[in-house]
Amino acid sequence: MTNYIFVTGGVVSSLGKGIAAASLAAILEARGLTVTMLKLDPYINVDPGTMSPIQHGEVFVTDDGAETDLDLGHYERFIRTRMTKRNNFTTGRVYEEVLKRERRGDYLGATIQVIPHITNEIKRRVIEGAEGHDVAIVEVGGTVGDIESQPFLEAIRQLGTEVGRERAMFMHLTLVPYMPASGEVKTKPTQHSVKELRSIGIQPDILVCRSVGALPASERSKIALFTNVADKAVISLKDVDSIYRIPAALKAQGMDQLVVDRFGLECNEADLSEWEQVLYAESNPTAEVNIGMIGKYVELPDAYKSVNEALKHAGLKNRLTVNIHHIDSQDVESKGTQILEQLDAILVPGGFGERGIEGKIAAARYARENKVPYLGICLGMQVALIEYARNVAGMEKANSTEFDPETPYPVVGLITEWLDAAGTTEVRTETSDLGGTMRLGSQLCHLIEGTKVHEMYGNAEIYERHRHRYEVNNNLRDQIEAAGLKVSGLSTDKRLVEVVEIPDHPWFIAGQFHPEFTSTPRDGHPLFTGFVAAAGKYQKENH
């Protein structure tokens, strides 16, 4: 039977509930337990798929094609369990399902209310997502006291009561601010946050106190006294220079043992040796490289969270410190490619819309002509293709129909039909809804032997996650290949181009998929590892 740990946050948002929860999950997994994680998001959007990356951060895509909160990326980077569409749902998704059932008549004429109908649907989804694991860690988005969070908090209160104290724990994350003027930390915000939580019927079993420095024992005891939490269950979580230090920090304070004792689980001591190797590599680099990420959402780094992390993971594998320079593609348009001259490699990530596209195309051209290592992801592949078509294949004004519907050379166009991972034919048109209509999730890709990308993966068949609605136009593919661009990966039905590369370039690879979603600190990812290695080589030879 599954045991539940419900995670809530108080005082302020952005305290790192997802990181703290994932770190606890990593320790429990290191003890031999099977662990999964769920994120409950209080916003009314059905999913984050159509939300602005500048507001919400990146959209993380799972193997089964769910467009989810970026916290699921943290979960997959900390534990081996792969997330699915069951691991993240929103208020909008819950209401959509309840209203659908009401229209069908499933409720037999009852008046539909938040309690019990909405809360029952939340509980059903939590139980379904947790099924089959020793422990499920359930994170509730937002902050205690938010109006939007109330149905979720009520649902987890009910579920905790229904499964019993032997199978449910509540973990609350709060801020303990430091006041420089008095030289003191202040516990009052934490006391009030717990008071708010208790007013709705939830007594936390573990308090994780975020602070600038380690909390003195006297302050931990004071918090324990006023919140009715055991002294040993008040965990101090100070700021650290690497999030991968947090599992060891929590284990040192016995957090995993609190969970094991509460649930009566028999398991081994946690083996964190893999995390120790990660920290050693992070602390002992042999050199550093400068990689430019040419994007359009650079004002919010979380918009490219998984790409940032994947580059860091590749740095660990190469024992290199990766300095990531987020460069607005519109700056490349206005200031020219001279702003790229000090870079050791260039990465163009995914994105949508015409704004800044010419800057990305210029960056791809700069990388090609100056033999700078280049990695294109999704849109990054499309701009590389457009650039090559224009400047090498002689297709003047070549473009994507997304940006110029009247282009004389539509080298990239809307995918109108494709086979999904289950073998089902999907059809789209220009008038299809934006939400949930892209080619999504893990897809099989066949790599061409003898290519650089085949060398990187060491395999002819790979699975990578996708999120796009535009693809290479096969009607112009032969003409571009004849000019020297190599198609090095194709979809299962051979109809969609998945990877391209330039054979006479030291390292120029671009893929329609998103390899960043499967990179982890312990394993890295072959494409990113190869890319950062190429950056290191370029740096030695040119800088």
Swiss-Prot record:
It catalyses: UTP + L-glutamine + ATP + H2O = CTP + L-glutamate + ADP + phosphate + 2 H(+); L-glutamine + H2O = L-glutamate + NH4(+); UTP + NH4(+) + ATP = CTP + ADP + phosphate + 2 H(+). GO terms for cellular component: cytosol. Pathway: Pyrimidine metabolism; CTP biosynthesis via de novo pathway; CTP from UDP: step 2/2. L-glutamine binds at G351, L379, G380, M381, Q382, E402, R469. Residues 290-541 form the Glutamine amidotransferase type-1 domain. GO terms for molecular function: ATP binding; CTP synthase activity; glutaminase activity; identical protein binding; metal ion binding. Allosterically activated by GTP, when glutamine is the substrate; GTP has no effect on the reaction when ammonia is the substrate. The allosteric effector GTP functions by stabilizing the protein conformation that binds the tetrahedral intermediate(s) formed during glutamine hydrolysis. Inhibited by the product CTP, via allosteric rather than competitive inhibition. ATP binds at S14, L15, G16, K17, G18, I19, D71, K238, D239, V240. It holds the Pfam family GATase. It is an enzyme of class 6 (ligase). Residues 1-265 are annotated as: Amidoligase domain. Keywords: ATP-binding, Glutamine amidotransferase, Ligase, Magnesium, Metal-binding, Nucleotide-binding, Pyrimidine biosynthesis. InterPro entries: Class_I_gatase-like (IPR029062), CTP_synthase (IPR004468), CTP_synthase_N (IPR017456), GATASE (IPR017926), GATase1_CTP_Synthase (IPR033828), P-loop_NTPase (IPR027417). UTP binds at S13, K186, T187, K188, P189, T190, Q191, K222. Its EC number is 6.3.4.2. CTP binds at S13, D146, I147, E148, K186, T187, K188, P189, T190, Q191, K222. GO terms for biological process: 'de novo' CTP biosynthetic process; pyrimidine nucleobase biosynthetic process. CTPSs have evolved a hybrid strategy for distinguishing between UTP and CTP. The overlapping regions of the product feedback inhibitory and substrate sites recognize a common feature in both compounds, the triphosphate moiety. To differentiate isosteric substrate and product pyrimidine rings, an additional pocket far from the expected kinase/ligase catalytic site, specifically recognizes the cytosine and ribose portions of the product inhibitor. Belongs to the CTP synthase family. Catalyzes the ATP-dependent amination of UTP to CTP with either L-glutamine or ammonia as the source of nitrogen. Regulates intracellular CTP levels through interactions with the four ribonucleotide triphosphates. Homotetramer. This is CTP synthase. The lineage of its organism: Bacteria, Pseudomonadati, Pseudomonadota, Gammaproteobacteria, Alteromonadales.
